[in-house]
A protein has these predicted regions:
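Conserved beta-strand scaffold positions in the cores of enzyme catalytic domains, especially
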Residues: 4, 70-72, 126
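A conserved beta-strand/loop element that lines the FAD pocket in flavoprotein oxidoreductases
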Residues: 1-14
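C-terminal, flexible cofactor-proximal segment of oxidoreductases
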Residues: 104-188
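Flavin-binding catalytic cores
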Residues: 1, 38, 97-113
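FAD-site-proximal beta/loop scaffold in flavoenzymes
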Residues: 16-19, 23-97, 104
């Protein structure tokens, strides 16, 4: 059975047990942690409009309306997409596209050209589930298993900066597939 405990802060996770703030101890073999994240304290302290997650509200140029010329992107930015009628999720895919837009607009400004608004283009989703397994969706087509895992790894390598890093990561993956991980447990 699955025991879902909402609003039950965990104070300790040990081998085979989870202790809650109210003193309950749950014996278990598997723990799945689905906790949220908190906004960066610097972002929290900014005197600007924020959403319920603490993200700074930005306009279509990724600028903070109260501070023209000041830009917020990535996890700290609440970026509304009118086409989706929703805020964009705080994902790497969104952040990378925002960074490209900001860089392009800086270059446009240096050339005396006008800025272009940020337009998000969803490229799909890929998730590695480990050990040759994954799930994905690209252009409305869902797939899973080894093909999804291989595509995830391929995209990961392509997105790395520089050939040296790509080769190091690929070699690490090859070595890891040939040999078991060397784990050491420290007891105090």
């Amino acid at each position: 059975g699955i025991d879902v405990r909402l609003y039950s802060p965990v104070v300790r996770v040990s081998d085979g047990a989870v202790e809650l703030a109210n003193g309950d101890i749950l014996t278990t073999e598997t723990v799945i942690w689905t906790a949220g994240v908190k906004a960066n304290p610097i972002v929290e302290a900014l005197p600007v409009e924020k959403d319920k997650l603490g993200r700074v509200v930005v306009d279509e140029y990724l600028e903070i309306p109260a501070f023209p010329g000041v830009i917020a992107i990535g996890d700290c930015a609440h970026c509304w997409d009118a086409r989706l009628n929703a805020a964009l999720p705080p994902t790497a895919q969104v952040a990378i596209q925002q960074a490209h837009c900001v860089a392009d607009n800086i270059m446009r400004g240096l050339r005396g050209e006008g800025e272009q608004p940020f337009v998000y283009r969803h490229r799909g989703d890929l998730v590695s589930l480990g050990a040759g397994d994954g799930v994905g969706e690209i252009a409305g087509m869902a797939f899973s298993g080894l093909p999804a895992w291989l595509l995830w790894r391929s995209v990961f390598l392509v997105k790395l900066f520089g050939w040296k890093n790509r080769i190091r990561v690929a070699l690490d993956w090859i070595i890891s597939s040939l040999f078991q991980r060397d784990l050491a447990k420290l007891e105090w």
